[in-house]
Amino acid sequence: MITLFRKPFVAGLAISLLVGGGIGNVAAAQGGPPKSGVFGENEKRNDQPFAWQVASLSERYQEQFDIGAAVEPYQLEGRQAQILKHHYNSLVAENAMKPESLQPREGEWNWEGADKIVEFARKHNMELRFHTLVWHSQVPEWFFIDEDGNRMVDETDPDKREANKQLLLERMENHIKTVVERYKDDVTSWDVVNEVIDDGGGLRESEWYQITGTDYIKVAFETARKYGGEEAKLYINDYNTEVPSKRDDLYNLVKDLLEQGVPIDGVGHQSHIQIGWPSIEDTRASFEKFTSLGLDNQVTELDMSLYGWPPTGAYTSYDDIPAELLQAQADRYDQLFELYEELAADISSVTFWGIADNHTWLDGRAREYNNGVGIDAPFVFDHNYRVKPAYWRIID
């Protein structure tokens, strides 16, 4: 551990004992990590304090960057709400603000889930990230249907293709305008476009791209700036930004857009990672590359799978996960947050893609590759909201 970038958490622990449940929680909260540095089975499962009994993550990093969590509206009550208020000072909607959630049919808006998240963030003085205005997935098909009811991508007539392009851009602009005007006083950073780079190189051949070329990216940012104002912070968000080839493709795109005057404020690094991948060196290189363009960096969807890719051989229950594997995860979280602190001047936010291990999209991936049975455990709080070894490593 490099102590230069770490600070004691005694003060935060004292506060947590006062607000986290009273005298009855003192013994649990003072338990801390085992002196050996490795959790035994019973110690791992039952002897660690609950998330609401320990020092706050957001207070620990308040001088460096925001600590956020992705949420669904139903998680804003009970224990999960208690954990959110204690550990996080930033929120993002996991699904409730995606295009298919907000405008499933043209002109028909569904604000209920998104509004609930906005109101929770406002009530508890939290920062709010918006995810996402434009994406190739979870976008309703009506965006890409022409006025005759045909798929725009199938059109071959040049004049009709141009008309379809303008219609799609108009629909996108209207969607962005409506959303940004509604939430601009609450949202502090916007994922304007998401996952536009293809893993195989170049731009993703989405319907957006096939119909408009790169114009949809440019117009999306310009529209968000127009209706959000200069104070709106606008991000281009993607996964695997640590992969050199994909990083370079994203860098070249962003550099070109900036040279055209497109208002981009930063890059969102999703950071869906694994214990053994990517390297800290590649992670550092990605942040530094976009910092060189004068851009902010945000870690937007952090989770750390126990497995490689694909996640074959997944454990079938939480109790089957070896203590040594959770310790390896803790070591990697430690290295990662050490890097984040070192580069804190260039990283404004670190958001986990969930609250605790009992709700993660990675469980679906584990089941997909293991005959319908499998779980993952990517966060610093376990499936019962107890702290994991990773928590103790990043709170010190």
UniProtKB/Swiss-Prot annotation:
pH profile: Active over a very broad pH range.
- Any one cellular-component term (Gene Ontology): extracellular region
Question: Can you tell which superkingdom this protein's organism belongs to?
Answer: Bacteria
- Keywords noted in UniProt: Carbohydrate metabolism, Glycosidase, Hydrolase, Polysaccharide degradation, Secreted, Signal, Xylan degradation
Q: List the disulfide bonds.
A: none
Q: Under which pathway is this protein filed?
A: Glycan degradation; xylan degradation
Q: What is its EC number?
A: 3.2.1.8
Q: Which InterPro entries match?
A: GH10, GH10_AS, GH10_dom, Glycoside_hydrolase_SF
Q: Does the keyword Signal apply?
A: yes
Signal peptide (residue range): 1-28
In this record, what's one Pfam family?
Answer: Glyco_hydro_10
Q: What is its main location?
A: secreted
The UniProt GO MF terms for this protein read: endo-1,4-beta-xylanase activity
State the compartments where it is located. Secreted
Domain (GH10) ranges: 51-396
The record places the active site at: 195 (proton donor), 301 (nucleophile)
Q: Which reaction does it catalyse?
A: Endohydrolysis of (1->4)-beta-D-xylosidic linkages in xylans
An example GO BP is: xylan catabolic process
Task: Give the similarity note.
Answer: Belongs to the glycosyl hydrolase 10 (cellulase F) family.
This chain's protein is named Endo-1,4-beta-xylanase A
